Amino acid sequence: MRPMFKHTALVIGLSISTALPMSIPVAAAPAPQAATAAADQPATTPRGTTFILPEGWTREQRGNAVVLTPPEADGSRLVIVDATAGSADDAVAQAWQALGMAPKFLLATDAAPRDGWEQRRSYDYDVPQNAKRVVNASAYRRGKLWTVILADVDQGIAEKRASQFGKLFQRLLPAGYVRETFAGRSAHPLDAARLQQVANFVEQMRKDFDVPGVAIGIIQNGKVVMARGFGVRQLGKPAKVDADTRFMIASNTKALTTLMLAKLVDAGKLDWNARAEDVYPGFKLGDAATTDKVLVKHLICACTGVPRQDMEWLFEGEKQTPASVLTTLGTMQPTSGFGELFQYSNPMAAAAGYIGGQVAYPGSELGAGYDRAMQALVFDPLGMRNTTFDYVKAQTGDYAAPHGYDINHKVQVMGMGLNDTIIASRPAGAAWSTVDDMLKYVQME
């Protein structure tokens, strides 16, 4: 269970120079011949900023701008141009002007330097809800040069192609910059002094980011060298976090669910290459052809074309049951071809867990069968005594209370309301666990 997709958008990056008037011929000049990428490939802007051109996208160079268009070719676009400007705000403003757009400013947020960029700033804009578009901007600086990224993208495309956008943004690097690699290098032994450095860093970050409590575990050479907590379990109370404090582990649950399936495969009770519908006839998607293609291994590959579609469990989760989750999954239509894109799906992961539970305990209630399978095949063998899907048990004794920001951006103790919505889809992200228990899982891996 990851955070919901939030305004991740296609971007239009424009190179800007304060020494010259902005006249990037993005739309006015005749477009040169476009080239479509047959596979992900490295690419550069005229000034050498590097990025990955995603498979199926079209690249055009127009003056000092690079225009990237997704396969849908519906007007969504990405333009990247390296620039020189006095500030991030100036660079972004001139970039929008060059595109002939003037979106209504909403918020600017600074991000930490990384990947060779000395300054990063992102911008959100107020877009009419019915426009169903994602509009945002990002400015990246190295020295006096800027790369500005502007987004004006259809919301559906932004969601469907989020993995491609992520790859493009995460591989956007300044000209000449080479990421550090640890290949072929040996890690220093984590002696007492280095472990104290780690502890000091974690504690400082915890304070800087107003995190009430955190627990951390480290394994080196197969041995646990750190398992401890920092801060408190609940604001306003003295009880400290330790290695046995239970936290919700969200989508880390998926890895444990997959381990349960693997144990069934090892036992000869399940086949990765069996059709999911043959294993459990109640499995359905909204598209019969896609349903027919889904094998057990595809339930957890995020490759079937089924979109994220989290609103059902977020708005109706407390009313849902495991059975209704599978019923809802049966209405979901794929938005991309089978195997075409990585599209994260919590309902598909939930189906994987519930199908595994039925293989282990045929005829049981979906949730109960899954819970029993996880206990018998994962938690008990690994000695994960504090890992559970029992929310009453989890919130007794040593556990981390939920916290969040109030309207004044102050961290406060919050209710469990939103967290409870995942219970009906629990194979995707509802387990509670501890650092000590998760270290046992990591040691097994």
Task: Give residue spans per PLM region.
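Signal peptide processing junction and immediate N-terminal pro/mature segment
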Residues: 20-34
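Extracytoplasmic/secreted envelope proteins and their assembly/folding machinery
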Residues: 54, 65, 89-96, 162-169, ...
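Short active-site loop at a secondary-structure junction
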Residues: 208-215, 237-299, 334-347, 426-429
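Short, surface-exposed loop or secondary-structure junction motifs
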Residues: 223, 227-230, 234, 287-445
